[in-house]
């Protein structure tokens, strides 16, 4: 009888703490949403040919984003933590032409696009993902970077330094 009462008391205590844990979890989730910055406009992706043409006109560098969008964990982190940050989107909108060079495993990609992406991967000697390769309008490499933790603002600072931008 003594053990039965102790067991009931223990289970009762556990049941009483569940609402507190759930409320704490909800509150922390709400706080995360409230502190997340409002996203800037989406990145403007261009084809490689379009980016070269536009870069010849406005002299902005081209950023080739080599990614495995549906299987590469670090590519997905880079997309979420850096490329989709308001700081990076603003910077890219002002200073870059963005080209996604994707190597999906699950999602369908037209054969022509797959071949073009393979050519770009070979041309710029990309051996791992994710990788950003910055080029000029002539296709000359200016800089290259992979994923780095720290978020969009820190990454933009490193890109500016690598490209010698203010």
From Swiss-Prot:
Intrachain S-S bonds: 72-75
Residues that, per the record, bind substrate: 73-74
Domain spans labelled Thioredoxin: 32-166
Annotated EC: 1.8.-.-
Signal peptide: 1-22
InterPro entries to which the protein is assigned, alphabetical: AGR/TXD (IPR051099), DsbH (IPR050047), Thioredoxin-like_fold (IPR012336), Thioredoxin-like_sf (IPR036249), Thioredoxin_domain (IPR013766)
Keywords, comma-separated and alphabetical: Disulfide bond, Oxidoreductase, Periplasm, Redox-active center, Signal
Principal localisation: periplasm
Pfam families per UniProt: Thioredoxin_2
Record text on subunit structure and interactions: Monomer.
Primary role: Catalyzes the reduction of disulfide bonds. May function in reducing intermolecular disulfides between proteins and small molecules in the periplasm, or keeping a specific subset of periplasmic proteins reduced, or maintaining the periplasm of Chlamydia in a generally reducing state. Seems to be unable to oxidize thiols into disulfides and does not display disulfide bond isomerase activity.
NCBIfam families in the cross-refs: DisulfRedDsbH
Protein name according to UniProt: Disulfide bond reductase DsbH
């Amino acid at each position: 009888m003594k053990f039965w009462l102790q067991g009931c008391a223990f289970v009762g205590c556990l049941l009483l703490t569940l609402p507190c844990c759930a409320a704490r979890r909800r509150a922390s989730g709400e706080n995360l949403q409230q502190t997340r910055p409002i996203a800037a406009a989406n990145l403007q992706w261009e084809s490689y040919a379009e980016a070269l043409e536009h870069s010849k006109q406005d002299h902005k560098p081209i950023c080739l984003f080599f990614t495995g969008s549906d299987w590469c964990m670090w590519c997905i982190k880079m997309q979420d933590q850096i490329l989709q940050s308001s700081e990076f989107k603003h910077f890219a909108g002002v200073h870059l032409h963005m080209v996604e060079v994707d190597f999906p495993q699950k999602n369908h990609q037209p054969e022509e696009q797959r071949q073009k992406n393979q050519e770009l991967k070979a041309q710029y000697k990309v051996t791992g993902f994710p990788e950003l390769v910055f080029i000029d309008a002539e296709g000359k490499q200016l800089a290259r970077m992979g994923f780095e933790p720290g978020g969009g603002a820190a990454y933009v600072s490193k890109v500016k330094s690598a490209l010698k931008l203010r």
